[in-house]
């Protein structure tokens, strides 16, 4: 779940290099470089100026690039298709991209419609790490799918005021964390969530937790309501403790 976020006051929904740089500067101030393991971004997070910012701030990154990106390999300019050839996967270090020498991992995949596509991940570390690290971005996709259309329907709020949207988003983030932790606790201590033939769980941890909390709120079971209340307050106390710690950290370095 997000620990820091900003709302963009534009209609496109896309961020500029300046937007991304400003956001990361605030995160670095809040957390410190040593607590940021890496930056994982999709195809929007590209460009030599953004790469330069990441280099200057000593941040490792794993960023998906577009398939029309021109690569410089051993002095020769290549498209991704030419680089991959007939292979299913290719890992290369010391590849020229946007004026930098970086590492790249390329893999054949299928898009959401089942058509052939490429997954190309650029990194300033090593090519063999790129695909595995980029998979962590899937949890971000799951989070946004959950808050948009699988439970909270955030976009149906029709709020326009940026401050109100920001507050609502913060509360939804906390609610998501509560549902997720409830589902994980159920899976761990009550009953394992069954796995279907397609290897996915019958219900995600989030969905299971959301269903449990909904059922509790719809009943008059005082014991269940009491336990839910305690669970919520534990989460709130955890957030308060961490906020206090971060605020103290900011005062010390500021």
Where are the language model's segments positioned?
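Single, function-defining residue in the core of a domain
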Residues: 1-254
């Amino acid at each position: 779940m997000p620990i820091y976020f900003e709302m963009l006051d534009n209609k496109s929904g896309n961020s500029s290099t300046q937007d991304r740089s400003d956001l990361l500067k605030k995160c670095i101030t809040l957390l410190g470089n040593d607590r940021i393991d890496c930056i994982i971004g999709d195809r929007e997070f590209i460009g030599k100026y953004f790469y330069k910012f990441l280099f200057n701030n000593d941040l490792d990154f794993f960023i998906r690039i577009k398939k029309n990106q021109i690569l410089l390999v051993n002095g020769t300019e290549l498209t991704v298709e030419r680089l991959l050839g007939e292979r299913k996967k290719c890992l290369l270090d010391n590849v020229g991209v946007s004026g930098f020498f970086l590492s790249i991992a390329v893999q054949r995949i299928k898009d959401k419609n089942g058509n052939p596509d490429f997954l190309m991940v650029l990194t300033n570390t090593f090519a063999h790490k790129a695909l595995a690290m980029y998979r962590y971005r899937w949890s971000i996709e799951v989070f946004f799918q959950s808050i948009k259309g699988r439970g909270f329907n955030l976009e149906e709020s029709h709020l326009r005021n940026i401050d109100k949207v920001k507050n609502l988003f913060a509360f939804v983030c906390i609610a998501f964390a509560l549902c997720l932790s409830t589902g994980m606790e159920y899976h761990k201590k009550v009953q394992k969530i069954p796995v279907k033939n397609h290897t996915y769980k019958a219900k995600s941890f989030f969905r299971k937790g959301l269903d449990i909390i909904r059922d509790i709120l719809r009943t008059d079971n005082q014991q269940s309501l009491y336990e839910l209340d305690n669970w919520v307050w534990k989460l709130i106390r955890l957030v308060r403790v961490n906020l206090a710690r971060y605020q103290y950290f900011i005062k010390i370095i500021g």
